[in-house]
């Protein structure tokens, strides 16, 4: 049931839990492919390099979404943006599950990354509508859901890929996103946009913040380097661990 939200007046516990869970389900789409790259490479008869591009392009899509999609939350109704992105996610995940063509998988992996950024809209919702006393706790809960999705996705993907094939996890992911669409339609109220202007003005304001605050530039650079190093290690390590240690997807 939809509940009216008022700024700084509190966020219903049911809605908070819903957003935290959906945040984890949504961001998990970025990582399902990582333990399965070797299996995908063998099944599609492509090189390890090309298979690794799947994980890389997915993360590039995520970066594009953070830069160009998330700001739309200030320009349009957030519920509409969430529903559109989740719908595109369903189509992208089903395409990955069904297509035999690696180039189409690469393209839909890019779309998957772009549209998996919606948890970054949930976090401002929690901050905006929570009371001052619960703001930090509620934002932390959404972030916890997000991190749980990141960690659990690899485990679930490896197990399902080992016993049911690598395509099955993407069918499961698409089904979960359909459920998320239905839940968002039912429980998330319309939140009016709070920016009056054009998209170009909105993007200019983002870049002006980067130019104005050196701490923001340093923090962004550090986070980018750390996250890039993490992904560079773990996306390529799956191939080497399976080859050298003969580990299966469930272990990876």
How would you name each of these model-derived features?
Residues 104, 141-186:
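Helix-loop-helix hairpin linking two adjacent transmembrane segments in secondary transporters
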Residues 64-102:
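Conserved MFS/SLC helix-loop-helix module at the cytosolic interface between two early adjacent transmembrane helices
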Residues 40-41, 72-73, 152, 156-164, ...:
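Interfacial helix-cap and linker-helix signal at transmembrane-aqueous boundaries
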Residues 2-9, 189-220:
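Juxtamembrane intracellular "pre-TM" segments in multi-pass secondary transporters
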Residues 17-48, 119, 233-238:
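Extracytoplasmic
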Residues 31, 59-67, 117, 150-151:
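Residue-level signature of mid-helix packing/kink "hotspots" within the transmembrane helices
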Residues 108-144:
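Cytoplasmic helix-loop-helix junction between adjacent transmembrane helices
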Residues 12-32, 110, 213-232:
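Pair of pore-lining "gating" transmembrane helices in MFS-fold secondary transporters
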């Amino acid at each position: 049931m939809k509940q009216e939200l008022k700024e700084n007046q509190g966020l219903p516990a049911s809605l908070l839990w819903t957003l935290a869970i959906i945040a984890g389900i949504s961001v998990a789409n970025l990582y399902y492919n990582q333990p399965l790259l070797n299996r995908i490479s063998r099944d599609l008869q492509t090189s390890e390099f090309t298979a690794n591009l799947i994980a890389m392009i997915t993360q590039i899509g995520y970066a594009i979404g953070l830069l160009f999609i998330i700001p739309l939350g200030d320009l349009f109704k957030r519920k509409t943006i969430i529903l559109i992105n989740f719908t595109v996610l369903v189509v992208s995940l089903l395409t990955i599950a069904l297509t035999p063509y690696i180039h189409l998988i690469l393209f839909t992996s890019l779309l998957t990354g772009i549209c998996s950024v919606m948890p970054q809209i949930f976090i401002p919702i929690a901050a905006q509508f929570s009371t001052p006393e619960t703001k930090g706790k509620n934002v932390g809960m959404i972030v916890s859901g997000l991190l749980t999705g990141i960690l659990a996705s690899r485990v679930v993907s490896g197990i399902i890929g080992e016993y049911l094939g690598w395509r099955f996890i993407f069918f499961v992911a698409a089904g979960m996103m359909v459920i998320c669409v239905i839940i968002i339609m039912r429980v998330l109220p319309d939140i009016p946009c709070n920016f009056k202007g054009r998209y170009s003005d909105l993007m200019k304001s983002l870049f002006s913040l980067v130019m104005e605050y050196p701490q923001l530039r340093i923090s962004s650079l550090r986070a980018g380097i750390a996250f890039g190093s993490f992904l560079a290690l773990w996306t390529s390590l799956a191939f080497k661990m399976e080859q050298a240690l003969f580990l299966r997807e469930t272990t990876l």
